[in-house]
């Protein structure tokens, strides 16, 4: 069973205060700790495409195999989508809700609108990420979303390293004939389908094998 090591990367649109994303990211990490969910807090905040490589390198160096992309404010559309692409593993995206209406200069996140743009950008790029049913929340709410993401990430990691060896009507290495199992290939599963003749041949080759 794959062991999931989560990392969280905050993103910030450069017309917002970067410290807002940092503060909200820390709050999410603290809430996760209270819930018993361990995750690595990436110190790089992604504002531009130049930050993406740095953030991915940081979480990879920490051994993370699953990622939470956290919109601490509106978020930069292209860099956050590239973050999902370049990381290459299971990724969840969630966004911060505004804590109060009393600080609309330095405390305005506008993350709900950013979440809409992010999901559309992912669709245009044909990238896959887990988006919770209600992806905008407080630190405690997002900690709950992250806890729910862990078993999903575990399943994705397990399937991505799965190899299925089957015996059916199609001979080995006839990928063009395997349209019915195409959805499995799309999930990253490696499939080797052998024909009944392949099975018969293998059986004969191992005749009298003491194993």
Regions found by a protein language model. Give the residues of each.
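An N-terminal assembly and electron-transfer interface module characteristic of large anaerobic redox
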Residues: 1-211
């Amino acid at each position: 069973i794959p062991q999931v090591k989560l990392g969280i990367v905050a993103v910030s649109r450069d017309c917002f205060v970067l410290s807002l994303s940092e503060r909200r990211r820390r709050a999410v990490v603290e809430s996760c700790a209270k819930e018993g969910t361990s995750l690595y807090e990436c110190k790089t905040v992604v504002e531009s495409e130049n930050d993406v490589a740095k953030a991915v390198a940081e979480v990879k160096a920490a051994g993370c195999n699953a990622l939470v992309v956290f919109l601490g404010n509106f978020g930069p559309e292209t860099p956050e989508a590239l973050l999902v692409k370049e990381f290459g593993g299971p990724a969840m995206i969630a966004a911060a809700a505004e804590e109060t209406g009393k600080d609309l200069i330095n405390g305005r996140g506008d993350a709900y609108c950013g979440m809409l743009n992010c999901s559309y950008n992912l669709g245009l790029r044909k990238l896959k990420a887990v988006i919770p049913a209600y992806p905008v929340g407080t630190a405690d709410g997002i900690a709950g979303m992250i806890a729910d993401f862990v078993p999903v990430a575990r399943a994705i990691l397990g399937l991505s390293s799965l190899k299925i060896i089957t015996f059916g009507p199609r001979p080995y290495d006839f990928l063009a004939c395997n349209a019915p199992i195409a959805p499995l290939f799309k999930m990253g599963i490696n499939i080797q389908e052998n024909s009944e003749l392949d099975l018969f041949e293998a059986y004969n080759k191992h005749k009298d094998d003491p194993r």
